[in-house]
């Protein structure tokens, strides 16, 4: 696998602890405590999911930092206690607790924070603007980048895209799954989650589909917009940007293979 430490494109999976990966992605007999170190050598990013369900310890974040390569980047899911609420404007205390939990122990390896919303959450312009206003631009001296993963059709509006763009927050670009796609780039980086791996493909996706995803990632990184993503508004001219691409859900056992194949194609 070719690993380019200078690439602005980071590719990975969700989490690193998954029983079916043992003996498939992870070598048989690899100690569980060595799994992150192994995954970090094969991938260029991982989306931490455990933070969505509950607080992690500062020493855990510090250990994860130390167990991965220098150029590795973690995306981190924001806590559900902030996003799964009727009135988003009241999420302030949950957001503050999250950033006090030790997440900054990831140091320079802290990538975007993904705030994932329930599939039933509808777009309320005023309340969503109040939520975005609560998101800090920095914590403990680290610049913080935010992404929002909205999963209801009501968000497919120019008003939502403009709102996200005004706050410099990336809209997660979902693909190959059940959720609506909003392909508009609204921040200085792109965050995409692709969900189409299948059991019948050794690499999760057909070779042609992997090549297409590699080209989309390269287009985003150069400041462009792939011609086949679904936009709500008008594309804006942009400079080169970071790209975070995660292979999620689908037939999860194949996700590491798909991610590694993408890294190889991106170069």
Question: Model-found features: residue ranges?
Answer:
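Residues lining hydrophobic/aromatic ligand-binding pockets adjacent to catalytic sites
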Residues: 1-267
């Amino acid at each position: 696998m070719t690993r380019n430490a200078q690439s602005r494109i980071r590719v990975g999976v969700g989490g690193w602890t998954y029983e079916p990966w043992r003996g498939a992605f992870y070598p048989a007999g690899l100690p569980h405590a060595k799994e992150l170190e192994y995954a970090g050598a094969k991938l260029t990013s991982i989306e931490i999911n455990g933070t969505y369900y509950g607080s992690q310890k500062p020493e855990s974040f510090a250990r994860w930092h130390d167990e991965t390569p220098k150029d590795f980047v973690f995306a981190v899911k924001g806590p559900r206690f902030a996003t799964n609420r009727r009135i988003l404007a009241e999420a302030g205390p949950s957001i503050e607790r999250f950033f006090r939990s030790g997440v900054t122990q990831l140091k320079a390896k802290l990538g975007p924070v993904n705030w994932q919303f329930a599939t039933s959450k509808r777009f309320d312009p005023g309340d969503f603007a109040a939520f975005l206003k609560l998101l800090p631009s920095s914590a403990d001296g680290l610049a913080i980048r935010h992404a929002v993963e909205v999963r209801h059709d009501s968000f497919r509006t120019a008003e939502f895209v403009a709102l996200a763009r005004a706050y410099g927050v990336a809209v997660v670009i979902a693909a190959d799954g059940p959720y609506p796609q909003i392909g508009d780039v609204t921040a200085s980086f792109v965050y995409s989650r692709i969900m189409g791996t299948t059991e019948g493909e050794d690499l999760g996706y057909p070779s042609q589909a992997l090549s297409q995803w590699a080209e989309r990632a390269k287009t985003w990184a150069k400041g462009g917009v792939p011609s086949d993503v679904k936009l709500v508004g008008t594309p804006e001219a942009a400079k080169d940007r970071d790209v975070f691409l995660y292979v999620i859900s689908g037939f999860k056992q194949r996700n590491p293979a798909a991610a590694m194949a993408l890294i190889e194609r991106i170069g």
